[in-house]
């Protein structure tokens, strides 16, 4: 007769349970060893008793390497297979979010341009009006500031041009003053030369004309007509020479 079929359920007797655990554990470890030797397989076995005691078997020298290999083969493939699906799902959610924002911005732009205002209620219209007023004030403020900046630049250029004009005017006045000074000095020098050399020339001319009356030297009797001519000549030269008569002719 063979052994009867054992019902698989928890053994209630504590002693029998411990005996059965020890027998089956040893048999399991033996089967794992036989499998690794007969089939050249990498086998690792980990068993914990109900009290938390550890029993293990590993066909290799390091249990951790076998566990790392098991983790890569099991959980790594799951992560690799699930990664594209998760990325696709996240990308689709991001797409839906961006699409909603894009449609909202398009609707706001049309409302700002005065289009599609029918679906808006009174509160939304008031909010749109306040938004437009704020935008208009900001535009006017920026425009005013731009005009003030331009005015300031033009005033600065005006001051620069006025300073340059003033400098050129002063330079022109200095040049005109120097020119008048040189012209006045030239006229005064010419008058002094005329005054200095005018009278001696007249005197010398009178002297030469008086000597031309009778160039010959005579001793004794002189012709009376020649004396009269000399007197007339001396009188004419004295009138031309401003009344100057040499002393030897008197």
UniProtKB/Swiss-Prot annotation:
Coiled coil region boundaries: 85-150
Pfam family, one: K-box
Mutant lacking the gene: phenotype: Triple mutations in the SEP1, SEP2 and SEP3 genes result in the replacement of the stamens and petals by sepals and of the carpels by a new mutant flower with sepaloid organs.
Cell compartments where the protein resides: Nucleus
Alphabetized GO MF terms: DNA-binding transcription factor activity; protein dimerization activity; RNA polymerase II transcription regulatory region sequence-specific DNA binding
K-box domain residues: 88-178
GO biological process, one term: cell differentiation
GO cellular component, one term: nucleus
Assembly with partners or alone: Heterodimer with AGAMOUS capable of binding to CArG-box sequences. Interacts with TT16/AGL32.
Name of this protein: Developmental protein SEPALLATA 2
Annotated source species: Arabidopsis thaliana
Name of encoding gene: SEP2
């Amino acid at each position: 007769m063979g052994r009867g079929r054992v019902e698989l359920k928890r053994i209630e007797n504590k002693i029998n349970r411990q005996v059965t655990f020890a027998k089956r554990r040893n048999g399991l470890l033996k089967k794992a060893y036989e499998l690794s030797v007969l089939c050249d397989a990498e086998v690792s076995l980990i068993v914990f008793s109900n009290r938390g005691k550890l029993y293990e078997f590993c066909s290799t020298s390091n249990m951790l390497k076998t566990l790392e290999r098991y983790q890569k083969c099991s959980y790594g493939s799951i992560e690799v297979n699930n990664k594209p699906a998760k990325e696709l799902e996240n990308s689709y959610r991001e797409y839906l979010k961006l699409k909603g924002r894009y449609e909202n911005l398009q609707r706001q732009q049309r409302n700002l341009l005065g289009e599609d205002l029918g679906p808006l209620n009174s509160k939304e219209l008031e909010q749109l009006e306040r938004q437009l007023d704020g935008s208009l004030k900001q535009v006017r403020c920026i425009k005013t500031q731009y005009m003030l900046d331009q005015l300031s630049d033009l005033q600065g250029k005006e001051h620069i041009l006025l300073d340059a004009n003033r400098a050129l005017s002063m330079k022109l006045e200095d040049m005109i003053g120097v020119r008048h000074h040189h012209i006045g000095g030239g006229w005064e020098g010419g008058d002094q030369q005329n005054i200095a050399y005018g009278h001696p020339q007249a005197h010398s001319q009178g002297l030469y004309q008086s000597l031309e009356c009778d160039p010959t030297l005579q001793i004794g009797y002189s012709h009376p007509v020649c004396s009269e001519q000399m007197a007339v000549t001396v009188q004419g030269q004295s009138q031309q020479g401003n009344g100057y008569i040499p002393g030897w002719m008197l």
